[in-house]
């Protein structure tokens, strides 16, 4: 999940937060939590298309994708692979062999790329894909060879927050699960086995919402990183597709707000962030982005309240501490700003902006020696990046 809207504030830039999902490679047994068994979870490709059209009748035919729609050639290869090993009597053995084959150079030979969402045919053509892409191929093939496989959203357990230039990227995690003799057996292409205690099985249509959300993010992220024109309207369309198929998909509402902000439609942006918060009061990203808008509008009190709410949800976010500190600094509350900047640099030691403002706080308090120590730290960080 991520946000991507640089904003000018007193000569500084506030990054937006955008949300996406990335991947996990191991098989393990784990427990399941939060599954809504009252709804259908898995579909055949044909029934999936029918259900999606019913959910989103306004969707154009060319926009509809079956994320797990493996090609006949891929199915033939998978079946031949398992037939060559007649001793694979158990489902867990078959699942393990299939999972390893996807990344085996002598089999499917796929590699992992964090920013590469694509349907199975394109993933195979490229030879790489992200967590959703690789997991989708596994799930599609597993079902074709008679295994029961589902998507898993493990974002509440596996989550990465990082900064790329002016973008704060908040990445969750999609993986898979197979029903075997040992119960739920987890399929993970990134090695975070120790992180799993419980997980949430999601239905195939929610996986499609993740697919569209990821595509929108990648359009923004790749263009910004390459310093190319950003296809914001295309990204906006993908976030809207995610909401079409799952109206309660909070991440897409948040990211929709990011693009509206970039396009200068701040009212629509604020409405999108508020919708995300109403749907999920624990969505710190939407609080963060809405707070950025409030700061941009000069509503420092409103921004401070929203940053504080976001931190109640997620205390380990250095960018939230920094932005709250920036508001406190502008309000003249130097003591509170000092504490916020200290927390930011404790969480991200190379956070230059937070170090610089901490030094400014010390200077204004007459603590010159401490200010110079912080400035020296900044110089060491910069020297290490040269």
Please annotate each region the language model reported.
Residues 220, 227, 261, 292-295, ...:
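Position-specific recognition of the canonical hydrophobic site in helix A of tetratricopeptide repeat
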Residues 209, 250-251, 284-285, 318-319, ...:
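Helix-start (N-cap) detector for alpha-helical repeat units in TPR-like alpha-solenoids
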Residues 111-253:
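Long, contiguous interaction/recruitment modules in multidomain scaffold/adaptor proteins
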Residues 241-242, 275-276, 309-310, 343-344, ...:
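Canonical positions in the second alpha-helix
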């Amino acid at each position: 999940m991520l946000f991507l809207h640089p904003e000018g504030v007193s000569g500084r830039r506030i990054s937006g937060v955008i949300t996406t999902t990335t991947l996990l490679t191991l098989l393990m047994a784990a427990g399941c939590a939060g599954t809504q068994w009252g709804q259908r979870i898995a579909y055949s490709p044909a029934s999936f298309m029918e259900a999606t059209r019913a959910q989103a009748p306004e969707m154009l035919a060319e926009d509809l994708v079956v994320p797990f729609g493996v090609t006949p050639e891929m199915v033939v290869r998978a079946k031949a692979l398992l037939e060559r090993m007649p001793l694979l009597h158990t489902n867990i053995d078959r699942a393990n062999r299939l999972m390893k084959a996807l990344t085996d150079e002598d089999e499917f030979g796929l590699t992992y790329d964090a920013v590469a969402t694509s349907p199975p045919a394109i993933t195979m053509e490229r030879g790489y894909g992200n967590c959703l892409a690789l997991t989708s191929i596994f799930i599609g093939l597993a079902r074709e060879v008679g295994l029961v496989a589902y998507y898993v959203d493990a974002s509440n357990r596996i989550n990465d927050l990082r900064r790329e230039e002016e973008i704060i990227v908040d990445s969750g995690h999609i993986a898979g699960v197979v029903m075997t003799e040992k119960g739920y057996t987890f399929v993970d292409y990134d090695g975070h086995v120790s992180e799993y205690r419980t997980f949430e099985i999601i239905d195939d249509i929610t996986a499609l919402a993740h697919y569209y959300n990821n595509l929108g993010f990648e359009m923004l992220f790749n263009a910004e990183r390459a310093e190319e024109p950003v296809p914001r309207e295309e990204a906006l369309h993908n976030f809207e597709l995610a909401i079409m198929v799952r109206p309660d998909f909070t991440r897409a509402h948040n990211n929709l707000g990011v693009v509206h902000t970039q396009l200068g439609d701040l009212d629509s942006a604020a409405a999108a962030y508020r919708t995300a918060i109403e749907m999920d009061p624990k969505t710190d990203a939407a609080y963060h982005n809405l707070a950025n808008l409030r700061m941009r509008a000069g509503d420092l009190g409103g921004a401070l309240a929203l940053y504080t709410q976001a931190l109640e949800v997620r205390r380990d976010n250095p960018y939230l501490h920094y932005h709250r500190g920036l508001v406190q600094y502008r309000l003249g509350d130097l003591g509170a700003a000092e504490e916020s900047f200290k927390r930011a640099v404790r969480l991200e030691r190379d956070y230059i902006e937070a170090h610089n403002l901490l030094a400014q706080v010390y200077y204004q308090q007459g603590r010159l020696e401490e200010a110079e120590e912080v400035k020296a730290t900044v110089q060491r960080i910069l020297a290490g990046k040269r």
